[in-house]
From Swiss-Prot:
Protein name: Beta-carotene hydroxylase
Class of the enzyme per the UniProt entry, highest EC level: oxidoreductase
Gene name of the record: crtZ
Source organism superkingdom: Bacteria
Pfam families referenced in this protein's UniProt entry, alphabetically: FA_hydroxylase
PANTHER family: BETA-CAROTENE 3-HYDROXYLASE 1, CHLOROPLASTIC
Domain Fatty acid hydroxylase positions: 8-135
Chain's role: Catalyzes the hydroxylation reaction from beta-carotene to zeaxanthin via beta-cryptoxanthin.
GO MF term list: beta-carotene 3-hydroxylase activity; iron ion binding
Assigned EC number: 1.14.15.24
Keyword terms: Carotenoid biosynthesis, Oxidoreductase
Family statement drawn from the similarity comment of this UniProt entry: Belongs to the sterol desaturase family.
Amino acid sequence: MTNFLIVVATVLVMELTAYSVHRWIMHGPLGWGWHKSHHEEHDHALEKNDLYGLVFAVIATVLFTVGWIWAPVLWWIALGMTVYGLIYFVLHDGLVHQRWPFRYIPRKGYARRLYQAHRLHHAVEGRDHCVSFGFIYAPPVDKLKQDLKMSGVLRAEAQERT
C-alpha cells in the first residue's frame, strides 16, 4: 500500500511540477526556445517542445536505475513520473492536440473542460498572457475566459490583425 501511495503522491507532485515548469520555464525566456514550437502551426509529427518529455524520461530512467540498485523508494517515484507521463500523453498530446490517428473531441465533463482550458491556453500568440498551465487539472473555463478578457490581450491581437 505504501508503494501505491508513493506513486499517487508522485503523480500529484508531477502536476505541480509540470505547472511550474510550464508557467515559469517553458513560457519564460529560458525555455521558450523549445516550447515556442508547440504554439506554432506545423505539420510535423514531432516538435522541439517534445524535448521536455525526453528530459523527464531521462530523469525517470535514472531514478529507476538508482532505485533498483540502492534506494527502492526512488524506483516507485520513477514509476509515478512514468504514470504521469502516460496521463500527459493521453490527455495533452492525444485528446487536446489530436496527435493520434483518430479524432475525438469531448462533448461534456472533465475531458471537455480540460480540452477547452488548453485551447484557451493557445488562444494567445506568444508566451505572455496565457492561462491554464496545468495538464491534469484545469481551472473553470469561465474563469479562464474572464482572465483572458481582463488581460486585454485578445482585443489587442484582434486589432493587430485588422
